[in-house]
């Protein structure tokens, strides 16, 4: 009888623990949206909260390319379209509502430089050609930028193959970014972590 009672108590405790875990999981699921590619979606408010804990790195793909569109070019044919510039500006306004303090680094292409310029409404920027080359060395390059920025938040304008590489390497997911899509990372103790996909709003 005693053994049966002990087993019953243990089972009740197990069920209570299991029920508690399910409640926590349900709560987390209701608070965080997920992209179809398996990446958590991070909006401006969530990004701002993360930035209070660690320096954040937001990597954007450039705006609409002129040489792959029938839309009007902003200027140079290797740059972005007028529509792309306007989209970048609107995105920059939404972004700055939650993150005002950041350093800006585009790769050394006309399309990324124009995208960064319109995104930030003319904020000073530093071109970094290493943001064009994506592979295992990209993390060291990002950490170098963080050190230059004295661990401030940084925004990088780069290319689709860079974002695809990071998503696959860090989380094992396929990410095929559209124009101005972005990934969010944070730095902690010298390491970079991929938090998810930035979703304005």
Swiss-Prot record:
Cellular localization per UniProt: Periplasm
- Which Gene3D superfamilies does this chain map to? Phosphoglycerate mutase-like (3.40.50.1240)
- Show the NCBIfam families listed in the entry: PRK15416.1
Q: What does the entry give for GO biological process?
A: lipopolysaccharide metabolic process
A GO molecular function term, named singly, is:
phosphatase activity
Q: Which family does it belong to?
A: Belongs to the phosphoglycerate mutase family. Ais subfamily.
Organism's domain of life? Bacteria
Provide the gene name from the record: ais
Q: In which pathway does it act?
A: Bacterial outer membrane biogenesis; lipopolysaccharide metabolism
Q: Which residues form a coiled coil?
A: none
Signal sequence range: 1-35
List the cysteine pairs that form cystine: none
Q: Where is it found, in Gene Ontology cellular component terms?
A: periplasmic space
| Main location as per UniProt | periplasm
UniProt keyword annotations, A-Z: Hydrolase, Periplasm, Signal
Job description of the protein: Catalyzes the dephosphorylation of heptose(II) of the outer membrane lipopolysaccharide core.
Protein's UniProt name: Lipopolysaccharide core heptose(II)-phosphate phosphatase
Which EC number(s) does the record attach to this protein? Answer: 3.1.3.-
């Amino acid at each position: 009888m005693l053994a049966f009672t002990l087993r019953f108590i243990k089972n009740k405790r197990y069920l209570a623990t299991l029920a508690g875990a399910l409640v926590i999981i349900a709560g987390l699921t209701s608070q965080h949206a997920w992209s179809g590619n398996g990446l958590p979606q991070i909006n401006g408010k969530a990004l701002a909260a993360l930035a209070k804990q660690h320096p954040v790195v937001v990597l954007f793909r450039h705006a609409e390319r002129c040489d792959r569109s029938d839309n009007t070019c902003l200027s140079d044919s290797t740059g972005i379209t007028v529509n792309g510039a306007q989209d970048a500006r609107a995105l920059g306004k939404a972004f700055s509502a939650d993150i005002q303090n950041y350093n800006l680094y585009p790769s050394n292409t006309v399309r990324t430089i124009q995208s960064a310029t319109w995104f930030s409404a003319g904020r000073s920027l530093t071109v970094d050609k290493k943001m064009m080359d994506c592979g295992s060395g990209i993390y060291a390059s990002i950490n170098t930028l963080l050190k230059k920025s004295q661990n401030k938040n940084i925004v990088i304008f780069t290319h689709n193959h860079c974002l695809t590489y990071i998503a696959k390497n860090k989380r094992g997911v396929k990410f095929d970014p559209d124009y101005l899509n972005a990934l969010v990372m944070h730095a902690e103790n010298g390491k970079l972590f991929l938090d998810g996909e930035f979703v304005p709003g």
